Amino acid sequence: MNSGPGPVGGRPGGRGGPAVQQNIPSNLLQDHENQRLFELLGRKCWTLATTVVQLYLALPPGAEHWTMEHCGAVCFVKDNPQKSYFIRLYGLQAGRLLWEQELYSQLVYLTPTPFFHTFAGDDCQVGLNFADESEAQAFRALVQEKIQKRNQRQSGERRQLPPPPAPINEERRGGLPPVPPHPGGDHGGPSGGPLSLGLVTVDIQNPDITSSRYRGLPAPGPGPTDKKRSGKKKISKADIGAPSGFKHVSHVGWDPQNGFDVNNLDPDLRSLFSRAGISEAQLTDAETSKLIYDFIEDQGGLEAVRQEMRRQEPLPPPPPPCRGGGGGGGGGGGGGGGGGGQPLRPPVVGSNKGRSGPLPPVPMGGAPPPPTPRGPPPPGRGGPPPPPPPATGRSGPPPPPLPGAGGPPAPPPPPPPPPPPPCPGSGPAPPPLPPTPVSGGSPAPGGGRGALLDQIRQGIQLNKTPGALENSVQQPPAQQSEGLVGALMHVMQKRSRVIHSSDEGEDQTGEDEEDDEWDD
């Protein structure tokens, strides 16, 4: 078993009690493979959830496609020596750690489909393509539980901190990416009223006005010499100048103490936040919401957001996984919602011009069916590119039980294929997802997600994309073509890295509260 303490059922005991913890195996792996995986974890490290995945990364500069980097066993690891949680990917054939991501408090774990999960990593957007949906669901539940507990603990500490200073032009954050300016209109929210922190201003040019700054006040003139007469001086029409500094304002629903009012958000703002993968917790966090507010104001305010959203077509919500057979023999039990072998399209999220545009399907030999209209997308479902297809073809019977595994359940049939190209008028289609590399010779039996497990056992080396990595060094990020959604995602990823680094210091102060959680 693990090189740490022997696995015993239950959760960690109280302060001073014996460590009672066990490693959770995967049903897709054989006993000796689970055993080997536990040995790779390290001293006093426990896996709370284990399954088989493909690791996809949306690499810079454009982050327009998913690139499959590794294939292996993923573990949600409780690392007691470091007093932190990690998502770690191990290669069973290589016998080593392939990739890891530490869990930070502001991490937003999204599930566009039951088998494809995504979140912002330290360097780029990360996607996990699971071989088994039930194990994927258990993995997601554990990750979100730990994120929620950490956020609750830190929100209690932040209530005692003073509110952040008001956003002033001289105090703008200098790390925002350059985005082409969006012209603002003069129609929007209520006009007039006091100019508060929650208002976006648009200048109305008027060359005929005088130098007076405020409507209804006299133009500045020489001071009176007679104090007695100046106290009761009447103001005539000649003393009143034309209005100046008149501005049209639109409300974005933000204040420096409570963040954005999530219950009264403008629909276009809500759509922008949904596409960029921003959660309600981030919108109500004082520091994070100030960063988002500054970004919106720098890009042209609410009118720029409205113009950006008007250029985007409404996107359909994700359909249920299609289980119906198609073409070459069907994937197994359960009738699919598509019927007749025509798969439904998964969600298309993100801006067509942004960091994560929709991807056309991998060439399968036939034209895909038209998308099924479903209405507008649900909130909170935006940001990363759509899920990639499984490793190999989608036809054929389910994979047989693995030899010597003692009869573990076989993985479920594959989910529906990726979406077709976007409709005309919604912008140029982004480059397609490159075909998933497979081994030479005849395809592995079982197809679909069973082949993903075979890749791990056989140790297939997946093709990398060195060109994309070289371009990320040679070229600056292509912010010009990303639009507001992609630029906002880029800003939030920077914010995640800052919070991640600052959490290391905060965790030191909260060690006394977490002593019961970690094993010595």
From Swiss-Prot:
Gene this protein is translated from: Was
Region (Disordered): 1-23, 148-247, 307-520
GRSGPLPPXP motif repeat ranges per the UniProt record: 354-363, 393-402
InterPro entries tied to this protein: CRIB_dom, CRIB_dom_sf, PH-like_dom_sf, WAS_C, WASPfam_EVH1, WH1/EVH1_dom, WH2_dom
Ranges of biased composition (kind: Gly residues): 1-17, 323-342
PROSITE patterns named in the record: CRIB, WH1, WH2
GO cellular component: a single term: cell-cell junction
Protein known as: Actin nucleation-promoting factor WAS
Phosphoserine PTM positions: 501-502
Subcellular localization: Cytoplasm, Cytoskeleton; Nucleus
Compositional bias of kind Polar residues: 203-213, 471-482
Domain annotation CRIB: ranges: 240-253
Subunit structure: Binds the Arp2/3 complex. Interacts with CDC42, RAC, NCK, HCK, FYN, SRC kinase FGR, BTK, ABL1, PSTPIP1, WIP, and to the p85 subunit of PLC-gamma. Interacts (via C-terminus) with ALDOA. Interacts with NCK1 (via SH3 domains). Interacts with FCHSD2.
Entry domain remark: The WH1 (Wasp homology 1) domain may bind a Pro-rich ligand. The CRIB (Cdc42/Rac-interactive-binding) region binds to the C-terminal WH2 domain in the autoinhibited state of the protein. Binding of Rho-type GTPases to the CRIB induces a conformation change and leads to activation.
Disulfide cross-links: none
Entry superkingdom: Eukaryota
Keyword entries, A-Z: Cytoplasm, Cytoskeleton, Nucleus, Phosphoprotein, Repeat
One of the GO BP terms on file: cellular response to type II interferon
Presence of keyword Repeat: yes
UniProt keyword annotation of Plastid present: no
Comp. bias regions, Pro residues: 358-437
Domain WH1: start-end pairs: 41-150
Post-translational modifications reported in the UniProt record: Phosphorylated at Tyr-293 by FYN and HCK, inducing WAS effector activity after TCR engagement. Phosphorylation at Tyr-293 enhances WAS activity in promoting actin polymerization and filopodia formation.
GO MF entry, a single one: actin binding
Free-text function comment from the UniProt entry: Effector protein for Rho-type GTPases that regulates actin filament reorganization via its interaction with the Arp2/3 complex. Important for efficient actin polymerization. Possible regulator of lymphocyte and platelet function. Mediates actin filament reorganization and the formation of actin pedestals upon infection by pathogenic bacteria. In addition to its role in the cytoplasmic cytoskeleton, also promotes actin polymerization in the nucleus, thereby regulating gene transcription and repair of damaged DNA.
